[in-house]
Amino acid sequence: MASIDSLQFHSLCNLQSSIGRAKLQNPSSLVIFRRRPVNLNWVQFETKGSFVCKAIGDSSTPDEDIQNTQSDDNVVVVTATTQSDIPHDSEYSISRFRSMVTTLPPVVFLMKKCSVNSIWIGVCITATVLVAAIRAYVVRKSRDNQRAGSVADLVRRGQLRSGDRRGISKSLNYEDPFNNPFVKLDKGSSTVEMCGKVYRLAPVTLTEKEQTIHQKRRSRAYQWKRPTIFLKEGDSIPPDVDPDTVRWIPANHPFATTVSDIDQDLAQNNVYQKQGVPFRIRAEHEAMQKKLEALQNEEKLNNLSIDSQNARDFQRPYKFSAKLEGENIQKNSQENHTGNSSSEETHKS
């Protein structure tokens, strides 16, 4: 066991109660030094002693002082009967006090009581709290800097493909927006309930012109779903065809001239043609050939029908006899007659 000396000042009444002698006359002021045990490993003391220094002389006799020392083994009373003994006692008490002060342990040795494990535990807790605070600050700062509706925000919410998926044709699986259990629509009162909150829709009133513009704009959004129909100029629009999907082509266009010549069933059957000239191109070519042949026949027939008056203008004046002239006239009349009969037959056919 180690001990630390402590300085205690006792009054007269406390000293009398501790000694237990009623007849003992103590001085007015005493200085008592006692040793108090403290758990220190580096110094060990087994004795517990105390001594009393009398600061002022007293009228008590030396015999009484000797009796007091015999009654209490642990208390040593030093008395000075004359003024010549006071300096010696004071020097002895001061030296004893200095020796006790030198035995006090420094602060460094008291700090060794803290174990190394507790220090490391404290360091780990402090580092954890610091890292959590830094992470929370960084997350909050990044959310503030990231604008709502940016590309990164849309990718994070799944509304836009990321840069590495833009070339992939496979679509992502999204939830059905028209069958969302968290969104409830009420068509009667025009209210929408989303996430537990009810929103009332404001009424929208559009003029007829605005309604037609809106319908056309919405119809263009689904233009890819409706096929484009080609009609010849002057034809009537079928009842089940949207006028916005009709494209007018001129009457002299090859597509317009071959519409009646191409059979729809044949066109459907020849969709997967792999060999030879495509069916549509061949049909268009054949139709154009027929029309050209018909035009050429009409021109030939028109050239064959020549009037007699116009033919006389192209004839040269010959100086022959009357017989030759009569023969030529008969031949011309016969040729004209055969030409007219052939033209009538072609018209009838």
Swiss-Prot record:
List, as start-end ranges, the regions of compositional bias called Polar residues.
329-343
**How does this protein lie in the membrane?**
Single-pass membrane protein
Q: Which GO terms describe its cellular component?
A: chloroplast envelope; chloroplast inner membrane; chloroplast intermembrane space; chloroplast stroma; nucleus
Stretches assigned to the Stromal side = 140-349
The yes or no answer to whether the keyword Acetylation is present is no
Q: Which InterPro entries match?
A: MCD1
Disruption effect?
Heterogeneous population of chloroplasts with variable size and multiple division sites. Abnormal subplastidial localization of the key plastid division proteins FTSZ1 forming multiple rings. Normal shape and number of etioplasts in cotyledons. The double mutant mcd1 arc6 exhibits similar chloroplast defect than the single mutant arc6, including the abnormal localization of FTSZ1 to short filaments and dots within chloroplasts.
Is this entry keyworded Chloroplast?
Answer: yes
Function summary: Required for chloroplast division. Together with MIND1 and ARC3, regulates FtsZ ring positioning in chloroplasts in an ARC6-dependent manner. Determines the site of chloroplast division in concert with MIND1. Not directly involved in ring formation, but required for MIND1 and MINE1 localization to regulate FtsZ ring formation during plastidial constriction.
Instruction: Return the protein name.
Output: Protein MULTIPLE CHLOROPLAST DIVISION SITE 1
Its source organism is Arabidopsis thaliana (Mouse-ear cress)
**Which gene carries the instructions for this protein?**
MCD1
